[in-house]
Amino acid sequence: MKNILIVGLGRFGRHIAMQLNQLGHEIMAVDWKEERVDKVLPFVTNAQIGDSTNAEFLQSLGIGNYDICFVTIGGSFQNSLETTSLLKELGAQLVISRAERDVQEKFLLRNGADKVVYPEKQVAKWASIRYTDDHILDYMEVDASHAIFEVEVPEEWIGKTVGELDIRKRYNINILAVKNDGEFGIAISPDTYFEENHKLLVLGEYRALQKCFRI
């Protein structure tokens, strides 16, 4: 369980609060609008109404005590930038800030953000990959050049084993798990046998995955 601060309680911040609550974390939520704070009360441990660009207000929250500080302010990039910078100055361990454009990401990283999330860009990339190929069931970006895909087993792999196909050497990808009847099996060996109804969880570079699965 981690102690987490969320600054900015619009839709994105509210959804983060809900997910973190489901994961069992301690959450302090902050926004300058009372109605936004009221909406997250069922999902957070504590909440305060206040101006996150005010150093005294932030200091009163005990910033150094939080494992993660999320800056999810939308609508005012200036406020997001100031809040990010102040959090770092006040001893925040890890600051994760939201960007809406590429240029914002650069400024946030230069002014205290340890990491930047870009929801619109990330969702657009996910949707474009997920829904343009019928055999791609899910997708998660690992870094700029690697990803994890859930895919249907290629037709030419059916009836063969991992060892026969020599997947890692031939395609430079890793089979993380095989899904059968809704259950993922992670004990992958050279003798793992592919059947028609199998789904695969695979890790690799984008180019290798695109070539292997004809994405």
Q: Which positions does each model-derived feature cover?
A:
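Cytosolic regulatory regions of ion transport systems
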Residues: 1-215
